[in-house]
């Protein structure tokens, strides 16, 4: 277990994961990188020098607490992760975050999308979800009540995995329907200035060691009127697109519920 937060380059963390036979998490490396023998030797030397400068590597090898945390990062038994767009101290900020645990070790790490650095800290495994949610910028729930609109009234264009780019658009109709007021409210929410968004996942390993991830992320959007959970709700008939005022508690409840369905079949 680490006794303090450390910041290392993304390349160094990826090298350390691969030394342990693991595969870098998708939030760290979306494109695999391969080195020839000479390049790999140089990368190993650079990694050791960087760690030594922070007191994490010495004549006896890796710092014991850091080594234990790396084992959990390389093969977490439980993980929460996501892509977040938001702001910090008035500035736009996009980053990825991963919290995981294995073998009694817990960790949380964040990677800024535009900078080559990963901030890493140890956490108590039983507080994993709370620590994960604490990395997400806080915002009050959206002002209003939950709204749900039949999917046929919604045009969806997904150009990326984040909620910010989902592009929900309610189709207008000259014919009034029972759900027209909710459609108008959903349209109003979508017209609000966007402050940020997020797509959050949970994954776990079963007894066989196989990893399973939830099929759909927990998505939210941040507007000038607060945060809204956005989700598609299946039913016996047509699915509905639902927007629900959300805070950290609501996001946590959705992630716990999704986690409970892993390996259910």
Language-model region placement:
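Short, surface-exposed polybasic-aromatic patches that bind anionic ligands, especially phosphate groups
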Residues: 2-265
């Amino acid at each position: 277990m680490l006794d303090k937060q450390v910041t290392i380059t993304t390349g160094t963390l990826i090298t350390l994961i691969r030394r342990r036979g693991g595969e870098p998490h998708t939030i760290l490396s979306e494109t695999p990188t391969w080195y020839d023998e000479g390049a790999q030797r140089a990368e190993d030397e650079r990694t050791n020098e960087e760690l030594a400068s922070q007191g994490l590597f010495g004549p006896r090898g890796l710092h014991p607490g850091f080594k234990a945390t790396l084992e959990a990062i390389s093969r977490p038994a439980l993980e929460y992760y996501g892509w977040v767009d938001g702001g910090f101290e008035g500035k736009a900020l996009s980053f990825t975050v991963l919290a995981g645990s294995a073998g009694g070790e817990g960790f949380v790490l964040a990677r800024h999308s535009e900078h080559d650095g990963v901030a890493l800290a140890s956490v108590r495994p039983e507080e994993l979800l709370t620590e994960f949610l604490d990395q997400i910028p806080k915002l009050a729930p959206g002002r209003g009540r939950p709204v749900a609109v039949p999917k046929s009234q919604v045009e969806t264009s997904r150009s990326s995995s984040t909620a910010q780019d989902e592009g929900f658009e309610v189709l207008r109709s000259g014919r009034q329907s029972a759900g027209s007021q909710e459609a108008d409210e959903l349209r109003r929410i979508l017209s609000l200035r966007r402050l940020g968004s997020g797509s959050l996942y949970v994954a776990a390993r079963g007894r066989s060691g196989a990893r399973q991830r939830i099929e759909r992320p927990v998505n939210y959007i941040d507007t000038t009127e607060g945060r809204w959970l956005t989700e598609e709700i299946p039913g016996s008939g047509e699915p509905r697109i639902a927007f629900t005022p959300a805070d950290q508690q609501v996001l946590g409840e959705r992630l716990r519920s999704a986690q409970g369905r892993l390996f259910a079949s």
